[in-house]
């Protein structure tokens, strides 16, 4: 009888050892975060690049399988813009900011809940029956009040745009308790502002910022982490100096920096600050253009992006 000998290339064995080393490096982080809740705000280039979309779904499924409870909160600006253009609906701007008219709000609602959310649920569920889509309207999950903005010292009405002032996490917890992954679109019923987020609804639905919505959800769930995917490497002390990337800062340090930040980073960093102030242990800005960036941040010693931590942790 003739036996065929099979040999392994030295390089393949080296690659295998590297992979084993990566798994061992991840072990203490898997042990630390198993059983905890992580809220991830999904947005930016990760939403429109097919490879990044698939990688994001893989990351969420990986988190689920190592015992973490991921909750995904998403916007959908590029998809909304595309649909408005296809339908011939002209966008109105005031002070450089989009005004959400009733006609535009119908599109926002349709795209976020009926397109972006469904596509993301489908990507995750290509790996198994894990994800369940939700809207901020479902079960009174989110409550919002209408907000405008100030441009050149004057109040500007942005239409059906709101800020989340209340979260009822019961529906999310039910899905998590069932072993599923909630995927939440950021539209919310409007309520009359009574100062504590529990006023009566008006019957109107508002478009809310996904960063601040994710922070509110993280706070309501008592999440261990809030992760916001964006299109930059993190927070820079002196933008655009790439060497000034900040790896970690305290809530007080961020509070001092906030008024001086670039306008595009303000809502994201304000969301991180809100989450930390309301008891979330860590808030992170992570580059969503990098495949598997969430896993690199969570399960490697070096981490990536910028993390915000409570003052007490540094002073302890």
UniProtKB/Swiss-Prot annotation:
This is Acetylglutamate kinase. The record marks 41, 268 as: Transition state stabilizer. CDD domains: AAK_NAGK-C (cd04250). Belongs to the acetylglutamate kinase family. ArgB subfamily. Its EC number is 2.7.2.8. The keyword Cytoplasm applies. GO terms for cellular component: cytoplasm. InterPro entries: AceGlu_kinase-like_sf (IPR036393), AcgluKinase_fam (IPR004662), ArgB (IPR037528), Asp/Glu/Uridylate_kinase (IPR001048), Glu/AcGlu_kinase (IPR001057), NAGK-C (IPR041727).
